Amino acid sequence: MGVDVLTTSNNHSMDTGYNGLINTIEKLDELGFAHTGTFKSQEDKDSILIKDVNGVKIAFLSYTYGTNGIPVPKGKEYCINLIDKDLIKEHLQKAKELDPDLICVSMHWGVEYRTKQNTEQENLADFLFENGADIILGSHPHVLEPMEKRTITLEDGTTKEGFLIYSLGNFCSAQKDKYTKDSIILNLQITKHADGKVTLDSYNYTPIYMQDNGAGAKDRYQIIDLNKSIKEYENGNSDISKNWYNTYVTELKNITDIMGEETNKTSNIEGDYKVSFIFL
């Protein structure tokens, strides 16, 4: 699938208790996944994850609003990053001291099944940008929420470009509520210039749909590239039914109504480096 980095702090991190959290970390380590958000020790929590993507150094941080009321064991508060401004500010400062090209923060926040962000998300996003975040990736609502590229004015008066998506939606799920089968693969074009400066030049998305083929199907769930599948049907190169085609058209409209038509991907991003994000 091409997944390189996982963020593991979310409201289900403690569902099977502390031991389950640790088992998950150990399995990810065994499989060779880079990950952040949950930790086996304070030392691990204090260590900032940095990945080199074609010469671009990206620091990754991850936080969640809570753990579904399941308490974090006393003395093991290090095991998960909860949304706390003092903690986040401390981590962002540590990340900046490592001199990455970009800092990417994943936030498990917001209200489930709402396709619009709330004031708390907006205020937290402002706080993150002001304290050093360059890219903010939201999750938890189980549906898509808007995205934007913005210019941030820092305390010293200088400006920088930042990118924010309030929710990436469900990439893979069995939920049936409206909008929960719709998601995107987010594509960011990042350029590292000859002078070492890194810029976020453009972005687009690939709209996808989680198709349920029924309990008796060999492959019950399929991830559908909506642009590709609609185009193939309209060109006579597809064996899907008219009903599925109509579903794809409807779901694509749901996505573009939330995310905007102008950034719907019609061709590959061209540039030096591309980084893609999904929420599983």
Regions found by a protein language model. Give the residues of each.
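Acidic, metal/ion-coordinating pockets
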Residues: 1-280
